[in-house]
């Protein structure tokens, strides 16, 4: 699976979906995250929890054995597609810059996406978990 910022934030903040997301990650042998997503999470966590948050994030990524994937040309093309078709101000999904990294890695790798919220449900990406 590919893991979006929203899922990691939910886990680190112990939100109601945290256990479902943690179990989904643990049960999947493929755990991917775009370097762009990792940067987005780092920016959010640093703003909220300073260096302690960064350490918590890095420890979680290590313990969960999440593989960080470099952003390549194929992902660039898919991210452009994502924004053109589902981007904020263009489509109800309103994907932002960071969302485009997760979308593109999910589509180019053929892996489902783990996310929280309703943005990706309005796209053609496959969800790793359905939260009601």
PLM features: residue spans?
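A generic structural signal for short hydrophobic patches within well-formed alpha-helices
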Residues: 8-9, 38, 120-121
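Acidic, PIN/NYN-like endoribonuclease modules and their adjacent C-terminal/linker elements
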Residues: 103, 107-132
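Short, well-structured N-terminal submotif of metal-dependent ribonuclease cores
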Residues: 1-33, 46-59
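Short loop->beta-strand "edge-of-pocket" segments that line small-molecule binding or catalytic clefts
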Residues: 30-32, 64-69
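Active-site neighborhoods of divalent-metal-dependent phosphate/nucleic-acid chemistry enzymes
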Residues: 68-112
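Histidine- and aromatic-rich ligand-binding microenvironments
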Residues: 4, 33-34, 95-96, 117, ...
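A general structural signal for well-ordered alpha-helical segments in protein cores
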Residues: 18, 38, 54, 76-79
């Amino acid at each position: 699976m590919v893991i979006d910022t929203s899922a990691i934030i939910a886990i680190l903040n112990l939100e109601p979906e945290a256990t479902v997301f943690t179990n989904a990650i643990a049960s999947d042998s493929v755990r991917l995250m775009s370097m762009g997503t990792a940067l987005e999470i780092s920016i959010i966590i640093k703003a909220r929890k300073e260096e302690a948050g960064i350490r918590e994030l890095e420890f979680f990524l290590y313990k969960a054995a999440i593989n960080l994937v470099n952003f390549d040309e194929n992902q660039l093309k898919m991210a452009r597609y994502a924004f053109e078709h589902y981007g904020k101000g263009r489509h109800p999904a309103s994907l932002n810059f960071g969302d485009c990294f997760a979308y593109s890695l999910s589509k180019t790798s053929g892996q489902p996406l783990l996310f929280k919220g309703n943005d990706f449900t309005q796209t053609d990406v496959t969800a790793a978990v359905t939260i009601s």
